[in-house]
Amino acid sequence: MNPFWSMSAASGRKRPEADEKTLSGELRTSPPRASAKKQLPSVPKNAVPVTKPASPAMSSQSTNGTHASYGPFYLEYSLLAEFTLVVKQKLPGVYVQPSYRSALMWFGVIFIRHGLYQDGVFKFTVYIPDNYPDGDCPRLVFDLPVFHPLVDPLSGELDVKRAFAKWRRNHNHIWQVLMYARRVFYKIDTTSPLNPEAAVLYEKDIQLFKSKVVDSVKLCSSHLFDQPKIEDPYAIVFSPWNPAIHDEAREKMLTQKKKPEDQHCKSMHVSGLSWVKPGSVQPFSKEEKTMPT
């Protein structure tokens, strides 16, 4: 019999007086027995609960379970979605290509077609934080420093944080950074410049500013065929015009195949009943076919 059950059952019955005396006598003479119920030791004063994080780092990991468990896969998916958005936007004059070695590095080039920087071809690299999209905004660095108020004259880095002071996930995207990099060449902003000389010349001596811009555009064009600074199979490389290669590619881009009109009409056809004869505007002009009996 279970001792716990026998003890609880015995406690519910009233014992005879003689038995109580005998039992009390035994308790006096026999040594004390340990209680059948186990008790936990007392909790120390400085103890920390198990459910409470021991450090802020652990707290950040617990609040972001997706990064903690699926970090690399989540990052890869986010960057793939970002590149898909870039392709869908079809930014005019902007081309990018993710690196072969790291998805956190994208190679790009901007073609400026009019304005002060007309005929400019500026190659750049986008550096994406490894905790994207929860970190800072991506960095955009030109291969050669462009003479511009918002471009650092030494490093060639564009002041991206001016437009994205705080990067907000699901709201800010990399295509917006690329669009901003294109827009700065058409709309000049001189407030808090990274290149004070360019800002002062734009405000006080526009002719000298234009002269330096022309020199900067020519400098970038003279180095257009240089090998990339970063060795990567997917780096953007320019080569001189080769008719044997480029003529055929140009013809394919310029030649547009037009679909026949009847095929276009078929694509625009809506399935369903129609009571109008093709080629007529009179309603109920279509002959109704009778089903054979």
UniProtKB/Swiss-Prot annotation:
Q: Which residues form a coiled coil?
A: none
- What keywords were assigned to this record? Apoptosis, Cell membrane, Cytoplasm, Membrane, Protein transport, Transport
Annotated membrane-spanning segments are none
GO MF terms here are: ubiquitin conjugating enzyme activity
UniProt-annotated stretches for the region Disordered: 1-64, 269-293
Q: What compartments host this protein?
A: Cytoplasm; Cell membrane
In this chain the UBC core domain maps to: 74-222
List the InterPro entries hit by this protein, alphabetically: Ub_conjugating_enzyme, UBQ-conjugat_E2_core, UBQ-conjugating_enzyme/RWD
One of its GO biological process terms is: apoptotic process
**Does the record's keyword annotation contain Cell membrane?**
yes
Its membrane topology is listed as: Peripheral membrane protein
GO CC, alphabetical: FHF complex; nucleus; plasma membrane
Start-end of Basic and acidic residues biased regions: 14-23
Protein family according to the UniProt entry = Belongs to the ubiquitin-conjugating enzyme family. FTS subfamily.
As for what it does, the entry says:
May function to promote vesicle trafficking and/or fusion. May also regulate apoptosis.
Protein name (record):
AKT-interacting protein
- The protein's organism comes out as Gallus gallus
